[in-house]
Curated annotation (Swiss-Prot):
The chain crosses the membrane at residues 27-49, 58-79, 101-120, 140-164, 206-226, 240-260, 272-292. GO terms for molecular function: G protein-coupled receptor activity; odorant binding; olfactory receptor activity. It holds the Pfam family 7tm_4. Residues 50-57, 121-139, 227-239, 293-318 are cytoplasmic. It is found in: Cell membrane. Keywords: Cell membrane, Disulfide bond, G-protein coupled receptor, Glycoprotein, Membrane, Olfaction, Receptor, Sensory transduction, Transducer, Transmembrane, Transmembrane helix. Glycans are attached at residue 5. It comes from Gallus gallus (Chicken). InterPro entries: GPCR_Rhodpsn, GPCR_Rhodpsn_7TM, Olfact_rcpt. Odorant receptor. This is Olfactory receptor-like protein COR1. Its main location: membrane.
Length: 318
């Protein structure tokens, strides 16, 4: 960890979103509200799926884990960002920085793989409906979930090992609101070649694999739906995929913009905005996207309300 007389800094200074004093408190209030909504909606959806027997299906097992990932994702990033709005000296310990980056990569890859598994689930449900109950059993679903968490953990170890090889002799100011790899590469005083290669290979392997699985799944879904003769059948099939497609487009669209655009278009200020979107905003939007026009979730909420407050809702008991 040392290079000559260079020693690892005990703290890093985060530049935050802005250095404008007049914007610190308004931004604090905005992101506190977003974080509160994120936790309430995601934890609420987790609880609803847990208590309602009608939602004990593969699709909702995966959605429950997606909500957990989003709540954890936001918690890894947002509280420290909120603190930087209130602190004059916006510091994070070296260990805290490493742990934040490890958790960030772990949850990013977990979400990416979850979206791929959810696409496969929709493929089996639409293209192989008769075999769906035997293919997507609860045991299979939980094995898939456990496997993707394990793979994401291994990937995060590889990423973090690349970060641990870096030295920071000349600067400890991270031009970001959290410990992401790009601004850390920028201030590294040691060669980043090996670390960068580790990050690119491991990141591309999982994220691109996820995107390929999603694309292949939806090619087969579209081919199957096109062959359905009734308009109602086509609408029902596509409607089960709409929420997932929106979530995939938001998450992977942002990730592709962040990491696959031409080098000449890279800008840390632009990266801050993009990072803000997929670390803070998307975790808030996902439960709303999956619940907004979801009849099963709405019915489950009615049943829970009816049970809790002791009145009968005809729609809830149907």
């Amino acid at each position: 960890m040392a290079s000559g007389n260079c020693t690892t800094p005990t703290t890093f200074i985060l530049s935050g979103l802005t250095d404008n004093p007049g914007l610190q408190m308004p931004l604090f209030m905005v992101f506190l509200a977003i974080y509160t909504i994120t936790l309430l909606t995601n934890l609420g959806l987790i609880a609803l799926i847990s208590v309602d027997l009608h939602l004990q299906t593969p699709m909702y097992i995966f959605l429950q884990n997606l909500s957990f990932t989003d709540a954890a994702y936001s918690t890894v990033i947002t509280p420290k960002m909120l603190a930087t709005f209130l602190e004059e000296r916006k510091t994070i310990s070296y260990v805290g920085c490493i742990l934040q980056y490890f958790s960030f990569v772990l949850l990013t890859v977990t979400e990416s793989l979850l979206l791929a598994v959810m696409a496969y689930d929709r493929y089996v449900a639409i293209c192989k409906p008769l075999l769906y109950p035997s293919i997507m059993t609860k045991a299979v679903c939980w094995r898939l979930v456990e496997s993707l968490y394990f793979l994401a953990f291994l990937n995060s170890l590889v990423h973090t090992s690349g970060l641990l090889k870096l030295s920071f002799c000349y600067s400890n100011v991270v031009n970001h609101f959290f410990c992401d790899i790009s601004p850390l590469f920028q201030i590294s005083s040691s060669s980043i070649a090996i670390s960068e290669l580790l990050v690119i290979i491991s990141g591309s392997l999982f994220v691109m694999s996820s995107i390929i699985i999603i694309l292949i799944s939806y090619v087969f879904i579209i081919l199957t739906v096109v062959m359905i003769r009734s308009k109602d059948g086509k609408y029902k099939a596509f409607s089960t995929c709409t929420s997932h497609l929106m979530a995939v487009s938001l998450f992977h669209g942002t990730v592709i913009f962040m990491y696959l655009r031409p080098v000449k278009l890279f800008s840390l200020d632009t990266d801050k905005i993009a990072s803000l979107f997929y670390t803070v905003v998307i975790p808030m939007l996902n439960p709303l996207i999956y619940s907004w026009r979801n009849k099963e979730v709405k019915d489950a909420l009615r049943r829970l309300t009816a049970t809790t407050f002791g009145f009968i809702d005809s729609k809830a008991v149907q």
